[in-house]
């Protein structure tokens, strides 16, 4: 378990050091968004990797393989649409994220059942959970 915690801490440190990858020349025109596109230009300093240019997304920026894709709490993130899907979750290694398309009534049911089963719901705040449980 200590190895897992070490990797989670390493993942957090790597995330903090990871630069914000932005599209080449994103600041020159408002029509060009900031979302990442790989530079392909023949004379592109960014593509070549000149030190005074912005960072290019490469394999070296990836986090540790064992904890890649996990929630910062260390639990696996499972998307839930209804109570039936919630029952299939293992609370020791998985947590629930309620889908955006779920309405308030079903959301309340899911939160109540999750509390009963001891499952953590990632996208509902503690304050909202208490409010839902009191209904």
Curated annotation (Swiss-Prot):
Keywords: Ribonucleoprotein, Ribosomal protein
GO cellular component: cytosolic large ribosomal subunit
Single GO biological process annotation from the record: translation
Source superkingdom: Archaea
GO molecular function, one term: structural constituent of ribosome
Family: Belongs to the eukaryotic ribosomal protein eL32 family.
Alphabetized NCBIfam families for the sequence: PRK08562.1
Protein name: Large ribosomal subunit protein eL32
UniProt source species: Methanococcus maripaludis (strain C6 / ATCC BAA-1332)
Taxon lineage: Archaea, Methanobacteriati, Methanobacteriota, Methanomada group, Methanococci
The encoding gene: rpl32e
């Amino acid at each position: 378990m200590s190895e897992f915690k070490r990797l989670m801490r390493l993942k957090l440190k790597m995330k903090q050091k990871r630069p914000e990858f932005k599209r080449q020349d994103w600041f020159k025109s408002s029509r060009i968004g900031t979302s990442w596109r790989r530079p392909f230009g023949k004379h592109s300093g960014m593509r070549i990797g000149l030190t005074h240019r912005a960072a290019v997304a490469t394999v070296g920026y990836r986090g540790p393989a064992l904890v890649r894709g996990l929630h910062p709490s260390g639990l696996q993130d499972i998307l839930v649409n209804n109570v039936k899907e919630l029952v299939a979750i293992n609370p020791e290694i998985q947590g629930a994220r309620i889908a955006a398309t779920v309405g308030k009534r079903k959301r309340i049911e899911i939160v109540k059942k999750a509390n009963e089963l001891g499952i953590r719901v990632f996208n509902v705040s503690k304050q909202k959970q208490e409010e839902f449980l009191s209904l």
